[in-house]
Curated annotation (Swiss-Prot):
InterPro entries from the UniProt entry: Indolepyruvate_Fd_OxRdtase_bsu, IorB_Oxidoreductase, Pyrv/ketoisovalerate_OxRed_cat, Pyrv_flavodox_OxRed_cen
Origin species: Methanothermobacter marburgensis (strain ATCC BAA-927 / DSM 2133 / JCM 14651 / NBRC 100331 / OCM 82 / Marburg)
Reaction(s) catalysed by this chain's protein: indole-3-pyruvate + 2 oxidized [2Fe-2S]-[ferredoxin] + CoA = (indol-3-yl)acetyl-CoA + 2 reduced [2Fe-2S]-[ferredoxin] + CO2 + H(+)
Protein name: Indolepyruvate oxidoreductase subunit IorB
The EC number(s) this enzyme carries: 1.2.7.8
Lineage of origin: Archaea, Methanobacteriati, Methanobacteriota, Methanomada group, Methanobacteria
Function: Catalyzes the ferredoxin-dependent oxidative decarboxylation of arylpyruvates.
Source organism, top-level taxon: Archaea
Thermal behavior of activity: Optimum temperature is 80 degrees Celsius.
UniProt entry tagged with the keyword Oxidoreductase: yes
Length: 196
């Protein structure tokens, strides 16, 4: 058995921290875990993605068409993940847009959100989209977006990690003074999404 997660967004959204929490939780549950990360630009706003693979896997790169779950912190980055998605993939999408630097100077406009979601729905098994930034702000801080997205992922059918293991990994990897906000964000994300 294997399970593949593709996490994508832009620098500064907490993609790598989220992936580290997932990876540690999987190891704590006794799973074989491999992870890779790609930084587009080494600054806020550059594309960032990670690939996390659990179980009977040999390499850290998810083969085309084999991602079981895509956690997209930014809608356009979700579109870029299309080749990684399996036909049955669950896609979690934060609808808050952060246009990439190369699009700002491009003659091509940022696609309408409705078109992005429609394209994802045509290519994946399940798509759940919501304004994660709004939920993070309501939880106490916009920088808790990554925990909103983690909570949403944990609510999906087939997600292989338990809530308690994820929370323990959060406690090991996040500042204690922000734990209350991050836990609230995690639970709000969990309640927002249910891919069944």
């Amino acid at each position: 058995m294997s399970y593949n997660i593709y996490v994508c967004g832009v620098g500064g959204q907490g993609i790598i921290k989220t992936s580290v929490i997932i990876g540690e939780a999987a190891m704590n549950e006794g799973m074989n875990v491999v992870m890779s990360e790609i930084h587009g630009m080494a600054q806020r706003g550059g594309a960032v993605s990670t690939e996390i693979r659990f179980g009977d896997v040999r390499g850290s790169i998810i083969p085309q068409g084999e991602a079981d779950l895509v956690i997209a912190f930014e809608p356009l980055e979700a579109l870029r993940a299309l080749p990684k998605m399996s036909e049955d993939a669950c896609v979690i999408v934060n609808t808050s847009k952060i246009p990439p630097f190369n699009l700002i100077k491009s003659p091509h406009p940022y696609p309408p959100l409705e078109e992005i979601i429609k394209t994802l729905e045509e290519n994946a098994g399940r798509v759940r989209s919501f304004n994660g930034e709004k939920i993070a702000v309501e939880a106490g801080h916009i920088l808790s977006l990554n925990m909103v997205m983690l909570g949403a992922a944990a609510a999906t059918t087939g997600f292989p990690l338990g809530e308690e293991t994820l929370i323990e990994s959060m406690k090991n990897n996040l500042p204690p003074k922000l734990m209350e906000v991050n836990l609230r964000a995690f639970h709000e994300g969990f309640e927002t999404v249910n891919c069944d």
